[in-house]
C-alpha cells in the first residue's frame, strides 16, 4: 500500500489506466470529493498509418500509446490516432454542503454519487449546521451538471427508508436513486463518440 497525501485544494493522481482527481469540499473537517476518470484514446486511423508508411507490426503498440523507433525513425501514437474520445467518469462526494468544486468536477460524469443525508425538507437547517447535503440539493447539482444518473448515499442514521423520498427527489432530477450497500453498475464506452 502506498499512501499519497493530498496537499492542495485539488490534486490529480495518475495510475496505470486511470486517474483520480481529488477536490476539496465544505465540511466541518477537511474533506475531499473524488472523480475517477478513464481516458480513451482516439480511433486508430489506418489511412494515416499507410500514408506515413508506418510498419504494420507497430500499429497495435502505437494504439496502446507506445512510442517506437526503427532505423532512426520515431513513431508516436499521435501519428495514427484521431481525436481523443469520451472516456468514463464517476464522481463521488459526501460530507459536504453543495459546492462549486463538486459542480466543476462532476461535469461529464457518467455516474454521480452524492450524499443525501436528509430527505425531510425541514432538515435543511440541520444540514447547513452540520455541513451536509439534503437529497434535494444533491438532485439539483445532478440536474445542473447534466449527469445521466445520480446515486444518493450517506444517509442519516435516523432515515431508515431513504427510498420513500425518491418521488419528490425525482421531481428535481428524474434519474436519482436511493443507493444501497453492494450496488454495482456497468459503465461502457460510448462507441458513437
Question: Model-predicted segments: where are they?
Answer:
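A short helix-to-beta-strand connector/capping loop
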Residues: 1-2, 15-16, 87-88, 172-175
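Short acidic, glycine/proline-enriched helix-loop-strand junctions
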Residues: 160-183
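Short, ordered loop/turn segments at secondary-structure junctions
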Residues: 117, 155, 181
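Positions that flank functional sites
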Residues: 121, 157-158, 184
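General small-molecule cofactor/ligand-binding pocket signal
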Residues: 1-7, 21-23, 177-179
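Metal-dependent phosphodiesterase/nuclease catalytic metal-binding core
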Residues: 7-152, 161-167, 189-193
Amino acid at each position: 500500500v502506498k499512501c499519497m497525501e493530498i496537499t492542495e485544494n485539488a490534486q490529480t493522481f495518475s495510475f496505470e489506466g486511470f486517474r483520480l482527481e481529488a477536490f476539496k469540499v465544505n465540511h466541518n473537517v477537511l474533506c475531499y470529493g473524488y472523480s475517477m476518470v478513464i481516458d480513451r484514446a482516439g480511433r486508430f486511423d489506418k489511412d494515416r498509418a499507410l500514408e506515413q508508411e508506418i510498419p504494420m507490426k507497430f500499429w497495435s503498440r502505437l494504439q496502446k500509446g507506445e512510442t517506437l523507433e526503427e532505423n532512426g525513425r520515431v513513431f508516436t501514437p499521435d501519428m495514427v490516432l484521431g481525436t481523443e474520445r469520451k472516456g468514463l467518469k464517476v464522481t463521488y462526494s459526501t460530507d459536504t454542503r453543495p459546492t462549486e468544486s463538486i459542480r466543476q468536477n462532476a461535469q461529464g460524469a457518467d455516474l454521480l454519487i452524492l450524499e443525501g443525508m436528509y430527505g425531510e425538507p425541514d432538515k435543511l437547517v440541520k444540514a447547513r449546521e452540520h455541513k451536509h447535503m439534503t437529497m434535494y440539493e444533491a438532485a439539483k447539482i445532478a440536474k445542473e451538471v447534466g449527469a445521466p444518473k445520480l446515486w444518493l448515499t450517506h444517509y442519516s442514521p435516523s432515515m431508515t427508508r431513504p427510498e420513500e423520498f425518491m418521488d419528490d427527489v425525482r421531481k428535481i432530477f428524474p434519474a436519482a436513486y436511493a443507493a444501497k450497500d453492494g450496488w454495482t453498475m456497468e459503465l461502457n464506452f460510448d462507441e458513437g463518440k
